[in-house]
Amino acid sequence: MDYSEHPPPPALDGLVKARWTLAGGGAPGDWIEQQAVPDGCVEIIRRRAGRSRWNGDQPAAFAVGLIERPEGFGISGDARFEGLRIWPWAWSLLSDIPLAALRGRWLPFAAAGIEERLAAARALAATGRIIVAAHSVEEMSRGTGMSPRTLQRWFAAHVGLPPRTYLRLLRFHKAFEQVPAQPSLADHAAASGFADQAHMARDFRALAGVPAKEARRAARGPFLT
């Protein structure tokens, strides 16, 4: 399996986390099983070839909502995908479907001019950059200028999760993405904002389904291979 991702253009920073591609790299009759872990994002996906399946066969164009546990999916060996990984607050710029209806599942979704529509939302992008960079709910509140209660309402409307729950997903996924290159899990836990290595271990078991040591070997982008 060949997976690669690229940062978004500056105009989309705060709304889009990454562009990515995925190819099975095998024959049409092959079937490749993977695990996706929570990353705090909504995925807008276009399959250019082959087949994919998660709780049933998927169409050529679909969106995947926030997940809060590892989810298994399969792709045929000849499958090829292009995806846009957006922060959840960007979803309302593209669809009237509530985020709650997309949580933990996929829905058929196709839209034209996605990046152009997102690029016009400069104020929302600025708020998004503050949210993503924050290390605590208090930092989110100070940076955005929202009171704690207003921030709670904003998250309910634009994310579908409480701020503290969402911050946990962001902290975990940052640690997950970087864990393959880490010689010391204890140092990695401290650098990633966990209270200690045991704290990181609990989140890896809950959100990746495997210990951090195993994830260090098997993590590839947002997947466990």
Cite the ranges covered by each PLM segment:
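Pre-recognition alpha-helix immediately N-terminal to the DNA-recognition helix
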Residues: 167, 171-174
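Positions that flank functional sites
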Residues: 171, 204, 220
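Low-complexity, intrinsically disordered or weakly predicted helical/coil tracts enriched
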Residues: 207-209
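DNA major-groove recognition helix of helix-turn-helix
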Residues: 155, 167, 204-205, 216
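Alpha-helical bundle regulatory/interaction domains
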Residues: 1-148, 158-162, 177-180, 184-195, ...
